[in-house]
């Protein structure tokens, strides 16, 4: 049972949300009085409460979603709040649906989407994983951060072939190494105000680090927003090569580190927007003609469930007609289907761009 001080804070937070008429978050939409009363006294076995789930969304009323999971059990215990939010965000993943088992599919179906190198600047595929037996950021102790980092770094140091590389802990990092990682766009910073308010940045930089292979085409972030972010990327449009590298890395890491998985929701992550496959496959792509015809761009993107962002990610402009385009769907489909849909959409966009020239 949550203690009285927590419940008092929750009551205040709920009042604040109710009064915020211009707040458009999914938290506000689905945290009704009856759901609130049903959940406010509950506590996971690791001690997380509804306050851990909603505090970022209460503090940041401009949140799009507004909830985070403090540990794996939270998705089950606080399901009356999480389930409708998940259904709303992952369009069509109903509360009765079950995410399919992991299936990377036939990796040879993926190709170089731009063999002439005229449109695609770079290609990236990432996924998120949580280590079984550990809560998510807000509930981790300093000792757990250190223990997780040593498990991750020793696992990664066993990687061979093109995945072989170096682990750089953020703790005690020299200015030179730091600058080198910033120049390569590899270094992650301490979390933004949304993550700060969710208590995702405690004991920073303890337990955080970055691994990359010698070619700088494979990267792992340890204890950034998720326990693990596994990233494969390179210049040009060879999605096949990027995907195959990611799949072999995930399979290697999984042999040594068990991942948190949920029967209904797939792989578990700190933020409910990343659940399921957790896979985001993206390209930086130059589409000058389509950039001038945004309506057509959005129409094709909609047809293939693609998300179109500015060059530097969410809430940014497309610099010089360069877009960041990725798959939107993460739940209710396999890893293979998610990336295949993105490949089909990108091929279609390139075809239309060529026709418009």
From Swiss-Prot:
CDD domains: arginine_kinase_like. Muscle (at protein level). The keyword NAD does not apply. ATP binds at residues 122-126, 185, 229, 280-284, 309-314. GO terms for molecular function: arginine kinase activity; ATP binding; creatine kinase activity; IgE binding. One of its GO terms (cellular component) is extracellular space. It is an enzyme of class 2 (transferase). Disulfide bonds join 201-271. One of its GO terms (biological process) is phosphocreatine biosynthetic process. Residues 113-127, 127-155, 204-218 are annotated as: IgE-binding and beta-hexosaminidase release from rat basophilic leukemia (RBL) cells. It comes from the Eukaryota. It catalyses: L-arginine + ATP = N(omega)-phospho-L-arginine + ADP + H(+). Residues 211-225, 316-330 are annotated as: IgE-binding, but no beta-hexosaminidase release from rat basophilic leukemia (RBL) cells. Its EC number is 2.7.3.3. L-arginine binds at residues 64-68, 225, 271, 314. Residues 119-356 form the Phosphagen kinase C-terminal domain. Residues 9-91 form the Phosphagen kinase N-terminal domain. Keywords: Allergen, ATP-binding, Disulfide bond, Glycoprotein, IgE-binding protein, Kinase, Nucleotide-binding, Transferase. Glycosylated. Pfam families: ATP-gua_Ptrans, ATP-gua_PtransN. PANTHER family: ARGININE KINASE 1-RELATED, ARGININE OR CREATINE KINASE. Catalyzes the reversible transfer of high energy ATP gamma-phosphate group to L-arginine. Belongs to the ATP:guanido phosphotransferase family. This is Arginine kinase Scy p 2.0101.
